[in-house]
Amino acid sequence: LMTSDGWKIKSDQSYFMGGTMYLVSYQYKDSMVDQEAKTMTVEFLSEPLCIDAPIRVGSIVDYPSNAPCYNIAYESNGPVFYDDYILIVPVFYWVHDGDDIKYHSLELVYDPSISGEVLKLHLRHNISNDEELRRDKYTIQYCAFDLQYVFSLSGKPDKIVIEYEKNSFNSNLESAQTTTYTLSYNK
């Protein structure tokens, strides 16, 4: 594993690492840090969680949502770039319980037919479980979206707008408001 500031993380524990971006919890002792080599040996506190998320290219009509998001910005959390292409979005959404999380999926949709001064991306939240559940708790899921292909189609923008269906009161999509979050892109 490599951190955003160039440190190499090593561990005696092994996990299958099939993705590119992970949320990692670990601890280390000062004696396990090599400042010159910029490496540290760590003990994972939990299994690393892959946060790679898909981007679809096509008409937004072909990629609808069936559930709202609670929000994508809350207090000091909000979308941020990890590097020139990886956009990390903290998505808050309604759940029934911890087991319900596995039925939720998140993706960004880029519709190349929609052009303008800013790059507009559409966040889609879907639940694959058809069971009617009372979703009255919310959770957060960090998603890492690789925008390299989108930028190859659109060019690098000055601003990016993420549009999504927001309902901060309940999990009802019909009473959700279409909301946008704008961030500058200065790469």
Where are the regions a protein language model picked out?
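Flexible glycine-rich surface loops and low-complexity tracts that mediate binding to linear polymers
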Residues: 12-40
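Beta-strand/loop nucleic-acid-binding surfaces
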Residues: 2-16
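Surface-exposed beta-loop interaction hotspot
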Residues: 32-89
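Short helix-loop boundary/capping segments
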Residues: 72-134
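Hydrophobic residues positioned within well-ordered beta-strands of beta-sheet architectures
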Residues: 24, 88, 121, 143-145, ...
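Short, solvent-exposed, Trp/other aromatic-anchored flexible loops in extracytoplasmic proteins
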Residues: 18-20, 127-169
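Solvent-exposed residues in well-ordered beta-strands and their adjoining turns
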Residues: 29, 91-93, 146-150
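Short beta-strand elements
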Residues: 170-187
